[in-house]
Design a protein with these regions (language model features):
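Structured, hydrophobic secondary-structure cores that serve as assembly/anchoring elements
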Residues: 1-104, 108-116, 127-133, 137-146, ...
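Short linear motifs in intrinsically disordered/low-complexity regions
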Residues: 83-84, 94, 143, 161, ...
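Generic N-terminal simple sequence motifs
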Residues: 93, 176-177, 194, 198, ...
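Short amphipathic beta-strand/extended segments with alternating polar/hydrophobic composition
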Residues: 94-98, 118-124, 144-169, 173-178, ...
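A broad "ordered helical/assembly scaffold" signature
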Residues: 115-119, 186-192, 434
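Intrinsically disordered, low-complexity regulatory regions of eukaryotic regulatory proteins
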Residues: 173-174, 183, 192, 271
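Long, low-complexity, polar/charged, intrinsically disordered or flexibly structured peripheral segments
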Residues: 181-211, 216
């Protein structure tokens, strides 16, 4: 008797992630031009420092997490790429500022980057009762606050202080001196920055700093190597504009490059900010006559939102892109990517730079300006879900993002097809696999139709795969879907009858 395993039926397709943002801007510390994965605000603060006055990257990332965002990538610009991750200065040589090295407990301690305050490293007693003499606790403080705690030993084990710090610390490195002691002396050392330390905001900024280069992995050009990103925002483009470091033409050049990047990748959206302090007529003129963007891979939000400024202990207006990306992520998690990310509360926003009326909304919405509005008793809400495309087929943001999701999921879930025999059996398996995935999406409400036949079709047969295509090594599958679209306007028809009663039809 023999047992033979035979594959049968459809192979399941797993939906890809739809809410991974990428932010490009200025930070107090951290590696330059290196896309760094960040999963929460604590990780961001540990790697890139806290809020920096005069910049918007920290506020955007904080607003993203506050509004429901998950993983994101952060790219710090303002200096040349430092492959060692030490946060080299604008000169790009990766040199640490003088005074950023000290000796503690028989070890040489070096700061990877200096934040807004001094970095202090302390050797403290090990936790627990009667610890071994070789064990101790290494505390790393930034501006007096403990940000890293390492339980280590002087012995050459996997818990050796040099090994642990190298693997886990984002702020310091530790090296053994000539004769490392068996017991680390208790004490502390401050790694102070001086005037030569790199600043969060460079003295000179150009459009190329944001755009970067794909080959050198700089700017948002370096994001091409990360396939999972679905949104791109550059909040500090506006901080440079406010400091007159970049002109309005430079702003347009960077945003056009963002759009081109997203169109080329085909799986992500550019979340754009307008210039600050524009009234509705000015933003309409900027959208139509100055910027003139036309892309199904970009969305624009207006106006700026007012948030609490932890750096200045006050309130300030910030570009909305970070908060909007968080709203996208929250909507995807709660309702699905097919739901338009609108009519959602903007968490953390206490006011708006411009209070919009219904008539102003009707002026801006048709040209693709997604308004953020304040409603009595309902808070500050996103009140638009359009792309910047002039093509009615791609007018709605959720339609474009749904197609991105379906395309990426099907492409990823059918990699097993490559090098399979290109025959009727393969085509049937492809049809079953994709149909099963789309039926599941239809049941979630992502596709329009009372039945699966009304919602989509999958065609993979001799018609889509003639002999010429087979000889060329191609297998072609045609998929058509009917996406759901948002109800932007609700119309009520009221009729009055002579009897005094009325009928309302929705």
């Amino acid at each position: 008797m023999y047992v033979e395993e035979v594959e049968a039926g459809a192979r399941p397709i797993e939906g890809v992630g739809t809410a991974v943002a990428a932010f490009v801007g200025f930070a107090g510390r951290g590696p330059f031009n290196t896309p760094t994965l960040v999963s929460n605000w604590a990780q961001y603060a540990q790697t890139f420092g806290d809020f920096v006055e005069g910049t918007y990257l920290g506020q955007a990332v904080y607003g993203y997490f506050l509004n429901g965002g998950g993983n994101c990538y952060v790219v710090r610009i303002g200096g040349e790429r430092d492959d060692a991750g030490t946060g080299g200065g604008p000169s790009g040589n990766g040199a640490l500022p003088s005074g950023a090295t000290g000796v503690l407990g028989g070890y040489k301690v070096t700061a990877k980057a200096i934040g807004a305050g001094d970095i202090t490293v302390e050797v403290a007693d090990a936790a627990g009762e009667n610890p071994a003499e070789d064990r101790f606790t290494l505390l790393v403080k930034d501006a007096g606050k403990v940000v890293e705690t390492h339980h280590v030993t002087t012995k050459r084990t996997k818990e050796n202080v040099v090994t642990v710090v190298r693997e886990k610390s984002n702020l310091i490195t530790v090296e053994e001196l000539a004769n490392p002691p068996a017991k680390a002396d208790r004490g502390a050392v401050a790694l102070r920055a001086d005037e030569s330390a790199p600043t969060a905001v460079p003295g000179k900024v150009a459009a190329d700093d944001y755009v970067g280069d794909v080959a050198d992995r700089t700017g948002f050009g370096g994001l091409e190597a990360i396939d999972e990103i679905t949104m791109v925002a550059v909040p500090d483009l506006m901080s440079a504009y406010q400091r007159d470091q970049i002109s309005l033409e430079g702003v347009k050049a960077v945003q056009l490059a963002m759009i081109a990047h997203c169109e080329q990748m085909g799986d992500r959206m550019a979340v754009l900010d307008p210039p600050p302090a524009l009234n509705p007529q000015q933003v309409r003129d900027w959208r139509q006559n100055v910027a003139g963007y036309d892309s199904k891979y970009a969305a624009l939000y207006y106006p700026w939102v007012k948030v609490f400024d932890a750096a200045g202990d006050d309130h300030l207006f910030v570009p909305p892109s970070g908060h909007m990306a968080g709203v996208w992520a929250r909507t995807d998690a709660g309702r699905g990517v097919h739901k338009a990310p609108a009519n959602e509360v903007v968490r953390g926003a206490v006011a708006l730079q411009t209070q919009l009326t219904k008539n102003e909304q009707e002026l801006l919405n048709p040209i693709g300006v997604n308004c953020v509005r304040s409603f009595p008793g309902r808070g500050i809400r996103v009140w638009g879900a359009r792309t910047l495309s002039s093509d009615p087929a791609w007018r709605y943001l959720n339609v474009r993002r749904l197609f991105n999701y379906l395309e990426e999921s099907i492409l990823s879930g059918t990699q097993w097809v490559v090098f399979e025999p290109n025959d009727d059996a393969l085509w049937a398996r492809i049809r079953r696999t994709i149909s099963a995935f789309l039926v599941n999406e239809w049941r979630k409400g992502a596709l329009f139709g009372l039945t699966p036949d009304e919602a989509f079709y999958v065609k993979c047969d001799r018609e889509t795969n003639p002999a010429e295509a087979i000889d060329a090594g191609q297998v072609v599958c045609e998929v058509g879907i009917a996406p759901v679209k948002p109800a932007e306007f609700v119309v009520f028809r009221l009729a009055q009858f002579s009897g005094g009663t009325s009928l309302v039809n929705e």
